[in-house]
Each structure stands twice: as C-alpha cells, then as structure tokens.
C-alpha cells in the first residue's frame, strides 16, 4: 500500500514538474517572440581643409543599441541608447484603433519636423547625414540656441495612416527643449506632419512647427540689437516657428529626395533647400550626390552652399563603406560667420545588425 502511494505521489510530482517546465518554456518562447534587438555603429576618417589649416582625424560618430518589445498586439515599448553620447529615445506606443488609423506615443522620440529628421542615419546617403537646414531647424546640433538634441524631444504624439497607407499624419506636442530635459518655459511646441503617396515610389511631405524656444546660449546667427548685445540671449524665451515642403522618390533606377525649409526665430528668418540622391551601379555600389543651400540669417546674408559627391558599397544588407568629397562655401568660428571655401574628404564604415525573435 505504501509503495503504491509513493509511486502515485512521485507520478503526480513529475507531472506537475513537467507541466511547470513546459509552461516556463512556453513563457520564455512567447517573450522572445515579442522582443527585437537592433544596433549599429558608424565611424571613419575625415580630412578637412578650412581657413588654410588641415585637420585629419579618426571619428567614432555613433554606437547605438535599441530594443523594442511588443507587449500586446496594440501596446509596445522602445528604448535606445547611444554609447558614444547619451540615452536617445524611450517611449511607449498604444494603437487606439483596430487598423493603423490612430496610435498614441508618449516619451522621448524624434520630432516629425522635415522629411529627413525622422529617418535613421543608416539610411541616409551623406556621411554628414542630414542637410544643413534640417540639422539647424530640427535641433540636431548646429543651432546654439537649442544645442545638440539629435532632433529629439520629450512629449506626446498622435499619428496614423489611412487609404491603404497613401495618407499618413502626425501631430506632436513637445517640450521644445530637447532630450533628457524639462521644459525651459511654460509654452509647448506643436509640430504637424502630413505625407501623401499618390503613386508607387513617390511620397510628398509637408511639416510645420509653432512654438516658443528657451535659449540655452546666444547665437552668432541671430546677430545683435542696437546696443550690440545678442538679439537672443541665454535664458530668453523667443518665437520659434518652422515649415517645410518636400518629396521622396524611390525606383530601381535611382532614388532622390529634396525639400524646402524655412524658420523664424524671434525676428530672424532662415531658409534653404536641398536635393540628395543615389544611383545604383550594380553589385552593391551606388553613386551618391547632394546639393544643399541654406541661409542662416537672410537679413545678414549668412548663406552657405554645400556639395557632396561620392560612392558607397553595401557589402552586407545594411552594412556599407562610404567615401565622399564635401565642399562648403562658408564656415563659422566662435565669433564670426565667414564666406570662404572649405573642403573635406570623408570615409566611413557602417555596421548594422537586427535580431527579431521567431513569431509563434
């Protein structure tokens, strides 16, 4: 009798253990299927000739890692860190509709201003990544009033698409101060974005921003007032409006995108345009070219022309080697905007890896 009880008890325990083991494995498989991991690095060598001086230097521009988790079929979360700088993004998305018509996003993410800003550097033709106007107007780094914010901000976004993806919209409500920072004033910045795809391969984009900035430093681009003081000083709140209109066309023969941009900081107007593209030559090799014009202050004539020409070789999926010549017609010092030619030869390697768990 005792032997029978022992055997029965052992059988029950083994059954429970096997069931728990299977449940744990199923849970682990489910978690793995919902999580994706991504990472890339960009680094290389730059040789610059400016103001009669030559500057050769190796650069490690970006080392990014990010993971996104699909918590439910509607709810997801993303975290991104740049090991060469700071935490870049952390946000959660929740899809409110059964289709893709409306999703809400809360956290820190790229703002929707301009065509280029939301795009990854791994997909851009230029080693410099974005055009001068996009870099300046979206807070990617060249505007001293805002500082280096990588085109990102803290806030709330509503976005979605309709008509089988032909129409896409986005509305952002942002602090306007950049990454990992509290708002510097009481006002919020509003950014709108509208995309329309009338035919296969063509995307038309219009974006705009209305808001008030809080200056973290003065800027030589703003000029001075009648007393010789900076027009916008550190700590000042000022009007900051922008708008853009652009296009993107992709085909087997060539890819090209371009945009007109304009900004208003207090009473200072900036505007410009660019066109960038590439032509595949075969076997992973592309010709890359870009023309870029931007006037940082139209009243003071702070205009700059920029030309890029080069080659890129895709040796594995999203991994490539890039070699480019860059010409600019102007440059800045700490106190001056100078019209003068400067040249650069840039070489860069890009490595990107993506991992997604198998969906059940």
Indicate where each model-derived feature is located.
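Bacterial N-terminal signal peptides that target proteins for export
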Residues: 1-10
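Bacterial N-terminal signal peptides
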Residues: 11-20
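Outer membrane beta-barrel
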Residues: 26-48, 53-176, 186-191, 195-204, ...
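Sequence/structural signature of outer-membrane beta-barrel proteins
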Residues: 44-50, 74-76, 113, 174-181, ...
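Detector for outer-membrane/organellar transmembrane beta-barrel domains
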Residues: 197-297
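Outer membrane beta-barrel transmembrane domains
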Residues: 279, 284-314, 318-326
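Outer-membrane beta-barrel "beta-signal"
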Residues: 339-360
